[in-house]
């Protein structure tokens, strides 16, 4: 499966500013509901990922929901109320959560923090060739967005995992 998951506020740097929180949310979700990350890149305001789920399991929505919820909860738990998450660090504070960010009435009723776009885009990968195209898309996306000149310069990408020499255990 290929995914694009986006923050509600285009131009935010929250995902890269808070990469440790995001990585923790992904790791915890993987422990509870296993999946394999074929490729993943975290940009300041969105994520591209290619995942393989266990045979017979297609519940990727629950996994993304858990990742989003854990990330958001981590921000809320450490917040200094009244500060926007993207501005708190510039002001010398720990990350904050601003409950006054513009949220639709339905998001307010559901307690949605207004950090994430409500849904995500997914695409079922049809074959190995398409899988490789989508993996390459993940890895080259920071270049496409002008964040780096070479994909290996972007620190928040599985390209580093995929270019390391493989180590095998010899029994």
Enumerate the predicted regions with their spans.
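Short catalytic/metal-binding and nucleic-acid-binding patches
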Residues: 1-171
């Amino acid at each position: 499966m290929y995914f694009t998951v986006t923050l509600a506020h285009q131009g935010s740097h929250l995902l890269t500013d808070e990469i440790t929180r995001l990585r923790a949310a992904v790791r915890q979700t993987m422990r509870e509901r296993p999946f394999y990350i074929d490729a993943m890149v975290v940009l300041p305001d969105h994520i591209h990922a290619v995942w393989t789920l266990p045979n017979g399991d297609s519940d990727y929505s629950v996994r993304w929901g858990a990742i989003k919820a854990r990330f958001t909860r981590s921000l809320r738990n450490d917040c200094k109320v009244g500060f926007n998450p993207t501005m708190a660090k510039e002001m010398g504070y720990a990350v904050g959560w601003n409950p006054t960010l513009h949220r639709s009435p339905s998001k307010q009723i559901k307690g949605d923090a207004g950090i994430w776009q409500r849904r995500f885009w997914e695409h079922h990968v049809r074959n190995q060739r398409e899988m490789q195209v989508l993996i390459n898309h993940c890895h080259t996306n920071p270049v496409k967005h002008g964040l780096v000149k070479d994909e290996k310069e972007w620190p928040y990408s599985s390209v580093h995992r995929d270019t390391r020499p493989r180590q095998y255990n010899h029994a």
